[in-house]
Design a protein with these regions (language model features):
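A glycine-rich beta-turn/hairpin centered on an aromatic-Pro dipeptide
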Residues: 173-177
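Hydrophobic, aromatic-enriched interface-forming segments
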Residues: 115-118
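Conserved G/P- and acidic residue-centered "switch" motifs that form tight phosphate/ATP-binding loops
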Residues: 112
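Post-Walker A helix-loop "phosphate-sensing" segment adjacent to the P-loop in P-loop NTPases
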Residues: 123-127
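Active-site-proximal beta-strand elements of phosphoester/diester hydrolases
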Residues: 210-213
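N-terminal beta1-alpha1 cap of cysteine-dependent amidohydrolase-like domains
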Residues: 1-109, 120, 132-164, 171, ...
């Protein structure tokens, strides 16, 4: 049986830790999670002119996270936090491919910053720095390693995420200082933390359109793999 091909977006760096020239990067556990879920993956360079070819090639899409933020101007706001860091080229590419993927009803999973991007693509806004808006005992930028849990998320029983995980709670990691604020068109909250931060979103009218604020590719909770399995299975039917 042919395995579904899942496209995974890359991060880009200009630091000289690897090369003195700009380079792409992605953690292995993104593709390893797709492999474990029964799919195969390819990484997508930030070539906007090739977006249509990418979308004709792949059966599903993962928008990954990274140590950067979406320019608030894209969702009609000014920068209000000194902690906002931008990557213009990556954001432009991911915005365009996500918009087209949604229009095509292509199965899509947004992870961390990928969830935030999905929300912005659909007209939503973001909290630019959580501590500026929400007082909380939860450290959403955990100090312990990312392969360890940080906190619990509550999952709504009415959501597709609940149908996938069959659970009302998950232990997750946490590596973000921004979060979804106003929801984009067609999106619903599927999970949240006790302090009210939105941890997951979805469009129930799409074949598979889910965003999570944590990094399920670390497979901390056994239900993380179920998310990737659901993406791959939806992509198999694409």
């Amino acid at each position: 049986m042919k395995k579904p091909i899942i496209g995974i977006t890359l991060d880009e760096e200009k630091s000289k830790t690897y090369s003195k020239y700009p380079w792409y990067a992605a953690r292995k556990n993104y593709s390893e999670s797709i492999d474990l879920a029964g799919g195969t993956s390819i990484f997508l360079p930030h070539s906007s002119e090739n977006i249509n070819q990418y979308l004709n090639l792949i059966d599903g899409l993962v928008i990954t996270g990274g140590d950067f933020d979406i320019n608030p101007e894209i969702y009609g706001k000014e920068i209000s936090s000194k902690f906002v860091k931008l990557k213009k080229e990556r954001t432009f590419f991911e915005f365009e491919i996500t918009k087209k993927a949604v229009d095509m009803n292509l199965p899509l999973l947004g992870i961390c910053g990928g969830q935030q991007l999905l929300n912005v693509v659909l007209g939503g806004t973001l909290i630019q720095h959580i501590p500026d808006k929400i007082q909380s005992n939860i450290n959403h930028e955990q100090e312990n390693p990312r392969d360890q849990p940080s906190h619990v998320v509550k999952i709504k029983k009415s959501s597709n995420l609940y149908k996938i995980t069959k659970s009302e709670e998950m232990f997750v990691n946490s590596a973000h200082h921004q979060s979804v604020d106003n929801l984009g068109k067609g999106l619903k909250v599927n999970s949240f933390t006790e302090d009210g931060v939105i941890e997951g979103i979805e469009n129930p009218n799409q074949k598979f359109c889910i965003g999570v604020q944590w990094h399920p590719e670390f497979l901390i909770d056994d239900k993380d793999l179920e998310i990737f399995k659901a993406l791959v299975e939806s992509s198999r039917k694409n």
